[in-house]
Design a protein with these regions (language model features):
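Bacterial N-terminal signal peptides that target proteins for export
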Residues: 1-5
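Boundary at the C-terminal end of the N-terminal hydrophobic targeting segment
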Residues: 14-22
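Bacterial N-terminal signal peptides
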Residues: 6-15
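Asp-box/BNR beta-propeller blade signature and adjacent active/binding-site loops
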Residues: 21-420
């Protein structure tokens, strides 16, 4: 996010590492892709002609960076970013002249008026995804509010993380630290209908930081957030894990992870045996912690270059990784039956196809064992794509014999009207 073109195509001391781990194996499984086609299963939650947000200063048709959650009451929520482009910082823009010209050439729409940039919005379904409410504002700070993600706690508090983006500074460093890209959190105490007005700033050891979610509720009821950011010593970007034991009021840094290259868009999960696993963009680095995040194995790659990985542990213990693929494109998925040490996929360097889209998929497991997945159609880099972007959804099931995946119809196929 610090340099948007990457998305288009005191020093921090990292936590000590556990014994280095060899890279995971990939078991290639021919015939494991779904027989049902994505276009026969997907539906649109928000997009052209479907449940668009009401106009606001700075809205130009872009929607994306979304995430779902299923609440204990049965309601489903999907949060997303709405703005005018792939990134929607407030105007007047804060970009170095060269970067601004590159972004305008790429498709940043000239002449936009967006006093507070993009905002985070939310929709709700009370009938298991068949119909959805009109989008309403979740949070609108002075910055672009990106990648809202959720977790519901034991007491039904709903915690939401997001990060803010103001643009890019001359020379790479803002003179005003308040302009930096930063992770924030807000809470709801009524099932996501109202939210705290003043976000909590996550204090990290980085000069800037980001998170895409998902937040992770641990077996003991505490919550993890995985972030990436720039250490004060300079690049490459590192990953870190923080934990809250008091419903998101405060957060403690557990450990940081570094490699010889950037670790971005990091994701973490708790395995059935209590071990934690983390993955990151762009090289698909994976590492594990056996001591609750204090130390981590050395990050290793295994040929799966990916963007926006998201890890989920299913009820049967299967570890699933949604990701965008650098080698084949599209939103894809692979899964593991042994905590990420062996992955099942259709190829050594790509997962099973979910849809030929830009990716950035997030998921939630449903009572029937299938996954409800939300994702965006395009990255919104080109102006026409930004003006007509859509948030899609689909369902997916790992086959009972683990021979691959099956795509299933989205709950709202044929249901497009928002609920009152």
């Amino acid at each position: 996010m610090k340099a948007l073109l990457v998305l288009a195509c005191g020093a921090l001391t990292a936590a000590s590492t556990q014994a280095a781990s060899s890279g995971p194996d990939v078991v290639v499984l021919p015939g494991g892709d779904s027989k049902a086609r994505p276009e026969d299963c997907r539906a649109i939650l928000v997009g052209p002609g479907t449940n668009q947000p009401d106009p606001f200063p700075g809205y130009g048709g872009f929607v994306g960076w979304e995430s779902p959650v299923r609440l204990k009451c049965g309601d489903w929520l999907v949060g997303f970013n709405a703005g005018y482009w792939h990134a929607s910082p407030p105007t007047p823009w804060h970009y170095p002249a060269k970067a601004l010209q590159e972004y305008l050439k790429l498709g940043l729409p000239a002449g936009i008026v967006a006093p507070t940039g993009g905002r985070a919005m939310i929709i709700r379904s009370t009938d298991e995804g068949k119909t959805w409410s009109k989008p309403v504002t979740l949070i609108d700070t002075p910055a672009d509010d990106r990648h809202p993600a959720f977790v519901e706690l034991r007491d039904r508090t709903v915690l939401c993380s997001f990060f803010t983006y103001m643009g890019e500074p001359e020379g790479g460093v803002w003179s005003d630290p308040a302009m930096e890209t930063r992770v924030h959190l807000i809470r709801s105490f009524d099932g996501g209908r109202t939210w705290e007005k003043k976000p909590l700033l996550l204090h990290t050891p980085f000069t800037y930081d980001e998170t895409d979610g998902p937040l992770v509720k641990l077996k003991d009821g505490s919550v993890l957030i995985a972030i990436n950011g720039r250490p004060r010593s300079g690049p490459p970007d590192q990953a870190a894990v923080m934990r809250s034991t008091n419903r998101g009021r405060s957060w403690k840094l557990l450990g940081a992870i570094r490699a010889a290259h950037d670790l971005q868009e990091v994701t973490v999960a708790e395995l059935p045996g209590g071990e934690w696993v983390m993955m990151a963009r762009p090289e698909g680095d994976i590492c594990w912690s056996r001591d609750k995040g204090r130390t981590w194995t050395e990050p290793v790659t295994f040929g799966m270059r990916m963007l926006a990985p998201s890890l989920y542990v299913l009820r049967d213990g299967t570890l699933l990784c949604l990701h965008g693929s650098y080698t084949r494109g599209g939103l894809r998925v692979m899964f593991s039956r042994n905590g990420g040490h062996t992955w099942i996929a259709p190829g050594k360097d790509f997962g099973f196809l979910v849809d030929q889209s830009y990716g950035y998929g997030k998921a939630m497991e449903l009572p029937d064992g299938s996954l409800f997945i939300t994702y965006l159609a395009t990255g919104g880099h080109h102006t026409p794509d930004a003006q007509s972007n859509a948030i899609r959804c689909i369902r997916l099931r790992v086959r009972p014999d683990y021979s691959g995946i099956d795509l299933l119809p989205a709950p709202n196929r044929g249901h497009v009207a928002p609920i009152p």
